[in-house]
C-alpha cells in the first residue's frame, strides 16, 4: 500500500505540474493526499494562467488511431488486472491496489475492453506476430489463475471470488457484442 500511495502522490504532482485544475481519486481516503499536492503546487484557484503553448493539437489529432504495438506482457497484464479487479469487486472492494497502483473499475474497463477489441480487430496482433485470439486469452487467464492461487494459497484464492471473476471475464470477453459495463454483468453474480 505504501508504494501505491507514493504512486498516487507522483501522479497528482504530474497532474498539477501539467496545469490541471483538479483531479480524481479512486477512493475518498485519497482526497487529503491529492488536496495537499494541489494546494502546494497550485496556490491559485485555477491554472487558467498556465498556458501550454508547448502543445499543439489539431482536430485531426483527436481522431488518429494511436501508433504502437500490442505486447504479450501488455495482454497478460490486462488479463491480470481484469481478473484481480473483478474478484475484488465481487468481494465488496471497488478500489484495489494492483501492481502497486490504486485501481478502480475504470482501469478494469480499459483492460477488458482492449482484450475484447484486440481479439476482434484486424490489427489485434502481438509484437511477436501471434494473433490475439479467444484461445490465447483463455490460456493467459488460466495461467494467471494458477499464478494467483500459488501466490496467495489455495484457500485464500478460493475465498477471493477468483473462480467467479474468471468465469465472468471469460463470458464478457467471448460475447459477440461488447458488454456496456463490466460491473453490470458482475451484479448478476451478487444476486
Annotate the PLM regions:
Residues 1-191:
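Expand to "…catalyze enediolate/carbanion chemistry for C-C bond making/breaking, isomerization
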Amino acid at each position: 500500500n505504501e508504494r501505491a500511495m507514493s504512486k498516487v502522490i507522483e501522479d497528482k504532482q504530474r497532474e498539477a505540474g501539467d496545469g490541471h485544475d483538479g483531479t480524481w481519486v479512486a477512493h475518498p481516503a485519497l482526497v487529503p493526499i491529492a488536496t495537499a499536492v494541489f494546494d502546494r503546487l497550485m496556490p491559485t484557484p485555477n491554472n487558467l494562467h498556465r498556458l501550454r503553448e508547448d502543445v499543439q493539437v489539431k482536430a485531426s489529432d483527436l481522431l488518429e488511431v494511436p501508433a504502437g504495438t500490442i505486447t504479450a506482457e501488455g495482454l497478460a497484464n490486462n488479463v491480470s488486472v481484469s481478473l484481480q479487479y473483478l474478484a475484488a469487486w465481487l468481494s465488496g472492494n471497488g478500489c484495489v491496489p494492483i501492481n502497486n497502483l490504486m485501481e478502480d473499475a475504470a482501469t478494469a474497463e480499459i483492460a477488458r475492453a482492449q482484450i475484447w477489441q484486440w481479439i476482434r480487430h484486424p490489427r489485434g496482433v502481438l509484437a511477436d506476430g501471434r494473433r490475439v485470439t479467444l484461445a490465447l486469452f483463455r490460456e493467459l487467464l488460466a495461467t494467471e489463475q494458477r499464478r494467483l492461487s500459488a501466490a496467495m494459497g489455495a484457500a485464500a484464492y478460493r475465498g477471493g471470488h477468483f473462480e467467479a471473476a474468471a468465469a465472468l471475464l471469460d463470458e464478457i470477453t467471448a460475447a459477440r457484442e461488447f458488454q456496456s459495463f463490466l460491473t453490470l454483468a458482475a451484479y448478476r453474480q451478487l444476486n
